[in-house]
């Protein structure tokens, strides 16, 4: 076989320098993998699928009714302030939460039981090391006869132990949301101090108290059930809404900057 000039040169170099072998195969580039956010979304979906929840995707561009009015949020509520909400028109927004899926799911199913997990992008006019103008949330909704707070506690504990680890527990702390009554903030025991609030006699630098805030939850407000076409005298339910980025950072002990999750730093992203 006749060799090209370049091939002859490579072979000549090989003879002159025994440490150089042009016939050795090159290094194969590493394979890619799911981004940490995509991984987290997949994990959340599978955890709730085990409980019978069905994954839904509802609009990111939403009307005022599904975004606010139908969820018991009046026109003068601070959450409606255009300093936080992206208004495209007077009655059309980039939804700031995944709770818009509640009414849409009620209208779609019509007759309970309803078990929905709505995972999607949300938008708010905020930007800092702990907040981003675009982030992901997941909204859970369960409606049936005789649903009560103990069912909510069971679901939150199941999620916490499935995602964060079997030793983690949750607690409900009274709060206020327009679309749930009663309403709670869900806290999860801190993994760093094992829920004690202290390490070597000093306050835990992560939680300071033994607990970390997971997100909001509560029993669906009767008026919201009515707005969705569900009889509140016959059915009850609970809902919860938590951040994908937040739980990912909590699981992987990322305490510095939310924006790192959307960086192009391969060394950082390849850890997950």
Where are these regions (language model features)?
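TRNA-recognition modules of translation machinery and tRNA-sensing kinases, especially anticodon-binding
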Residues: 1-272
């Amino acid at each position: 076989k006749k060799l090209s000039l370049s091939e002859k040169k490579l072979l000549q170099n090989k003879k002159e320098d025994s440490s150089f072998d042009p016939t050795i195969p090159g290094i194969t580039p590493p394979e890619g993998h799911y981004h940490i956010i995509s991984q987290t979304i997949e994990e959340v979906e599978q955890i709730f699928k085990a409980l019978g929840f069905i994954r839904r995707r509802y609009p990111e561009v939403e009307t005022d009714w599904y975004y606010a009015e139908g969820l018991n949020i009046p026109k003068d509520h601070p959450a409606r302030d255009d300093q936080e909400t992206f208004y495209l028109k007077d009655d059309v927004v980039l939804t700031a939460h995944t709770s818009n899926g509640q009414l849409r799911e009620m209208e779609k199913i019509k007759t309970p039981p309803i078990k929905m997990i709505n995972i999607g992008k949300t938008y708010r006019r905020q930007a800092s090391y702990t907040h981003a103008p675009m982030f992901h949330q997941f909204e859970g909704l369960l409606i049936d006869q005789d649903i009560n707070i103990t069912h909510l506690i069971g679901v939150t504990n199941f999620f916490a132990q499935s995602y964060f680890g079997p030793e983690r527990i949750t607690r409900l702390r009274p709060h206020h949301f327009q679309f749930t009554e009663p309403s709670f903030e869900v806290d999860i025991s801190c993994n760093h101090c094992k829920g004690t609030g202290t390490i070597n006699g000093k306050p835990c630098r992560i939680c300071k108290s033994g607990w970390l805030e997971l997100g909001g939850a509560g029993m669906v407000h009767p008026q919201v059930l009515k707005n969705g076409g569900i009889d509140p005298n016959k059915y009850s339910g609970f809902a919860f809404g938590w951040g994908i980025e937040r739980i990912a950072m909590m699981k992987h002990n990322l305490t510095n900057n939310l924006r790192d999750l959307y960086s192009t730093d391969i060394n950082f992203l390849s850890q997950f």
